[in-house]
Amino acid sequence: MRTEQADDVLVLENIVRKFSAGETFVTVLKDINLTIKRGEMVAIVGASGSGKSTLMNILGCLDRPSSGRYWISGKKTACLSADELSALRRNHFGFIFQRYHLLSELTALGNVEIPAIYAGCSPQIRKKRAQDLLIRLGMGDRINHRPNQLSGGQQQRVSIARALMNNAEVILADEPTGALDKKSGQEVLRILDELHQEGRTIVIVTHDMQVAERAERIIEISDGEIIADNVAKVAKTKAKGQALQGKQNPKNQKTLGFFRSFAERFREAFVMALLAMNAHRMRTFLTMLGVIIGIAAIIAMVALGTGTREKILENFKSLGSNTLTILPGKSLSDPQSDKITSLVEADAEALSRLPYVSGVTPQVSASSTVRFGAVEVDAVIVGVGEQFFQTQGLNAVQGRLFDQKSVRDRAVDLVIEKEALSVLFPHSRESPVGKVVQVGQVPARIVGVIDQQHNGGMSNTLQVYLPYTTVQTRFVGTTQVRAITVKIADDIDSHLAESMVRRFLIMRHGEEDFFIRNSQLFRDRIMESTHILTLLVSSIAAISLIVGGIGVMNIMLVTVSERINEIGVRMAVGARQSDILQQFLIEAILVCIIGGGVGILFGLSIGGLFVLFEAPIHLIYTIDSIIISLTFSTLIGICFGFSPARQASRLDPVVALSRD
């Protein structure tokens, strides 16, 4: 049973550490029992492979023993979670490494501040303390220098300042002079002596007996066993109770609350992500490229689908919206339709009196020619009522449209399409209104010009319009009508109106010798087809975005592999698993968000090209598609960045630190 002493800071009992080697295990530490008291300066000495570094890793909670028990200031570590061990490292230990392990993207000041960020220290306090520590260690003129601008001795001093940032009570120094020249090594040992004099517990791991002799106590280890534990000299530290009570102890300073601390760590992760992206600009751009292309394709395809739909709707207006067209026969392909004579002008008059009908026009047609001077063209002569133009949404851009009087008097008032001007009057800039043209054998006066083609541009045949009574008497020689167009009131459902019109005409004719074409049904089918086509093309674009996301994941896996040493350093100074996860997840999300933003701009620029080259269809962008695309790119970053980030957060600190 262990008897706890008040000044025991590190206590190991029966510690064993084994590593697997294929199907066998190698025992590196064998039944280690060791107690280090508060304020001691201890040197652990041994040859390479003796197990001294493994022992230091267990002392610093960078590694877990295979068996045995370990207490830190009376707290048992065996059942602690990864984040609880991080808290112990953050609050109790400061690490000085042989290879310094400074982050190349940060200045000396930034490297020293890292432990305080994870401790939740406010920016002002941690910056002041980091500056004071660097000045104290003779680095005041190198505060803003990066590691590659510092000598080995200067880098080790920055490492010592980082170890002191959270006022650690235990300093663990692994071969602190191993990579330094003699003068720099002596300077580092002098600093460690000063820290010991302040009352800190110093543990030095070394193979150099001259370095070990600076300690009060020398522990020799060989083949994983302690073979000697000698007191070299009497401690000359501050009296117990005075150690580590300096006014600069950040634990005695005001720290940030949970949310502000989280926000500060998030800000640090964001800055580090930007620095990492800037350090590998070409790789970052190539990673973004897949996201850029995917987002641009989605934005452009959705805009193209919207533009196509609007163009179709624009053309569809010329065919009449919310209208019913009644035709003789069972269908357009009915061979008996020409023999059906029951559709007459009286049907149109009866339909016009229905309360849900806002306009009715009979319709007849004939093929003929239109001639003006030496110009003669084939044309379709369409006979319509005065309400035809209203039902079809057509307006006069010149002159007027014929009225009820023109229909009643069988006038030869002709209305032509605007597109017909360049055909009939190719060299004239005068208004055609009032001019007489020859329609077949009938002279007709042009009274108006309508603004768009009734056939929606789907036929090259010229169409001209006369009162249907005129066409009946002068062109077809019959009083029958070939179609009746019914305009439904705006507040009435066209499908309901269709069923009521069908019942009404069946009652009049005694049978269903007609069929009805509902413009709304035609419109719905066109919209459905357009929507399906847009979804299909957008799905293909989305696949390219997913491929881009896979590229992000691949690069993030490479990034984790390249920065594995950085991960170990951050964990050693107290970063939680969630901090590491956040660090790399933010980087992946940032790549995708920036790529998404550039992709949106690229997608918008495609619309400019359509305008520049006067394409018949313009891309129509919506704020919804832009927001959805940006959200989708963010989700790509989260989904494809989570696995590499999680892999990074679950690394063992000792494994990460051992990688070059």
Swiss-Prot record:
Q: Which GO terms describe its biological process?
A: response to antibiotic
Q: Which residue ranges does UniProt annotate as crossing the membrane?
A: 285-305, 532-552, 593-613, 625-645
Pfam families associated with the record: ABC_tran, FtsX, MacB_PCD
Provide the residue positions that the database annotates as binding ATP. G46, A47, S48, G49, S50, G51, K52, S53
Ranges where the ABC transporter domain occurs:
10-248
The subcellular location is: Cell inner membrane
Q: Which Gene3D superfamilies match?
A: P-loop containing nucleotide triphosphate hydrolases
What GO MF terms are annotated?
Answer: ATP binding; ATP hydrolysis activity; transmembrane transporter activity
Enzyme nomenclature, EC number: 7.6.2.-
Sorted alphabetically, which keywords does the UniProt record give? Antibiotic resistance, ATP-binding, Cell inner membrane, Cell membrane, Membrane, Nucleotide-binding, Translocase, Transmembrane, Transmembrane helix, Transport
Question: What CDD domains does the record point to?
Answer: ABC_MJ0796_LolCDE_FtsE
Self-association state and partner proteins as the record states: Homodimer.
Protein name per UniProt: Macrolide export ATP-binding/permease protein MacB
